[in-house]
Amino acid sequence: MIRQMLTSLAALALAAPLAAQEVTPDPTDWAAITGAAEGQTVYWHAWGGSNAINDYIAWAGDEVAGRYGVTVEHVKLKDTADAVSRVIAEKSAGKDSGGAVDLIWINGENFAAMKEQGLLYGPWAEDLPNWQYVDVEGKAAVTSDFTVPTEGLEAPWGMAQIVFYHDTARLAEPPRSIPALLDWAQDNPGRFAYPQPPDFLGSTFLKQAVMELAPDPSVLTKPVSEESYHEATAPLWDYLDDLTPNLWRGGAAYPQSGPRLIQLMNDGEIDLALSFNPNEPSNAIANFELPGTVRSYVLDGGTIGNASFVAIPYNANATAGALVLANFLLSPEAQAHKQDPAVWGNGTVLAMDELSAQDRARFDAIELGVATLTPAELGEALPEPHPSWMVRLEQDWTARYGVGQ
């Protein structure tokens, strides 16, 4: 899908230059931005598959409405590419202002596609007042999205890293490498599942596996080529050929999302699963969606991590309001609220040593859940492959193993 998107975008770029927005707020004039934002409605296109995340977005919307007079409408997505396609359709129709999408929760290949074809407003992120708190030195992912420099075209708002989780009442010693996972699955058929790509968690499992199995993982940081792709992925397909018949339902069906994995474990159908939020198992336990015996861990060789971003399309109708919302999402208050496992449990992008004592206290007061790893236990996250790898992996996985929705 992303490859088709890029082809369409390239054709559009050749057909006509991008028109400027009728009104483009100056990101450095914050007083003017907040003034222009008042009364605007921001249509924030964001994944809507988690109640905890949806509740957080609703909370953020209530806060910016009360403080700045900005209304936030959460347009719930199953796939971020749907929002990108909407912007492409508007570009094709010549709608270069007044677009339907004001803010997108985005990263990876979707950001790369929009950046390449000039479909993003900006740069603006580093002009936000709350940018001063972002941990640029300690978290390289906040300025490099799947190896693609962000260059101020998107603002980070959360950190994520793969964790595996298991019910210790049924699985005391889980597998701690990708090869060991296969051995365990063959001995315990039907007790592991991952979501069906292109669900982002399912696709991330493929990337985690190929990083561990590829003869030379360093090639994954560069744009994919035919030669590098076939050499790096041959062990992955051999691995999945062996793993698939030992998955939940014998690989004949796949969960459609991370929340579905939680439900399967709670129902006793699987013993091992994964999440891209280290706090999600604790959050689920707190909400009585998982048994209290569930615990999380990372693989011995480390796990993939990245940052989540928000971006503003070039033709957004409420650019000022989107800037105000993005800035609020970077505030210590919003970041600490989001990191609380009882709320969402998503990691902060802020540097603690840049915060006031009062704001640091917000984070110090957060209690880690029973299934949440400490930063030391998580370890340093492995970098994401270049986004072009994800496109190819999803296409080939679907051709080899894809099943009907």
Task: Kindly give the residue locations of the regions a language model identified.
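A ligand-binding cleft/hinge motif common to bilobed small-molecule-binding domains
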Residues: 111-113, 274-291
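Conserved C-terminal helix/tail region of periplasmic/extracytoplasmic solute-binding proteins
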Residues: 22-28, 263, 370-405
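Hydrophobic residues within well-ordered alpha-helices
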Residues: 87, 114, 261-266
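Short, polar/charged alpha-helical segment
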Residues: 27-38, 42-45, 50-71, 164
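Extracytoplasmic ligand-binding site segments that recognize negatively charged/polar headgroups
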Residues: 47-59, 74-82, 97, 101, ...
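Mature extracytoplasmic/periplasmic domains
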Residues: 303-304, 308-377
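Gram-negative bacterial Sec-dependent N-terminal signal peptides
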Residues: 1-20
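Periplasmic-binding protein-like
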Residues: 160, 239-243, 289-311, 360
